Swiss-Prot record:
Entry-linked InterPro entries: Restrct_endonuc-II-like, tRNA_endonuc-like_dom_sf, UPF0102_YraN-like
HAMAP family, per database record: UPF0102
Protein name: UPF0102 protein HS_0739
The organism's taxonomic lineage, starting at the top: Bacteria, Pseudomonadati, Pseudomonadota, Gammaproteobacteria, Pasteurellales
Annotated family: Belongs to the UPF0102 family.
A single MF term (Gene Ontology): nucleic acid binding
Amino acid sequence: MIQSKRQQGASFEYQARLFLERQGLTFIAANQRFNCGELDLIMQDRQTIVFVEVRQRKNQIFGSAIDSVDWKKQQKWLDAANLWLAQYDSSLEDADCRFDLVAFGATTNDIQWIPNFLDE
């Protein structure tokens, strides 16, 4: 059976969550939607809130999964994180947080985790 893009995305996001939990992170939330964008996963690493973007590319004709996180996507990611934090009377300026990327190739076995992606 052929999966829709949404189903495929959900599957890769779930695999990313399991991977990060095996690395010691704790799951907080998934698919938090705002007008400016969506937060795929929100995890916690000790006292740090981790906003996770999950990307997947079957091939690199249009660039890698990592390359697909352009400046515009990064701004949406930051804006959505700030809105999520605002729900808890916090902001990017005063919260201990970071932005990680989990990038997949064609399969869930082809995984790359980049902590602090936005600091690169």
